[in-house]
């Protein structure tokens, strides 16, 4: 019996979703180049806006997906968590992840 990718439905447990401005900052960071022009981090294969990423996942038979995110510096976790909350209200198949920056003074309030 032969199967193909579209014979199945998937849960993607490792998808990153961030507010667009944070996505852009992360992509810029990971694609920094050295003095020879080589990428020091790694290339980002799917540079898609959150709504486009949702559509791409749907096109691949992904029925549920995480918002696997992280705070990369002080003071952004609360903003990311609020964005994720709103995103998941709109996208019922999204499995929300929250994040925390250990040194945020208000971390207990936003967790």
State what each model feature region is:
Residues 1-111:
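Helix-coil boundary/capping segments in enzymes
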């Amino acid at each position: 019996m032969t199967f193909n990718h579209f014979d199945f439905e998937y849960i993607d447990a490792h998808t990153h979703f961030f507010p667009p401005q944070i996505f852009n900052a992360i992509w810029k960071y990971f694609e920094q180049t050295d003095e020879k022009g080589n990428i020091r981090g790694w290339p980002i294969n799917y540079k898609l806006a959150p709504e486009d990423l949702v559509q791409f996942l749907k096109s691949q038979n992904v029925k549920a997906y995480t918002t696997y995110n992280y705070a990369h510096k002080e003071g952004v976790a609360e903003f990311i968590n609020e964005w994720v909350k709103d995103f998941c209200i709109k996208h019922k198949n999204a499995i929300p992840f929250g994040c925390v920056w250990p040194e945020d003074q208000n971390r207990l309030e936003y967790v």
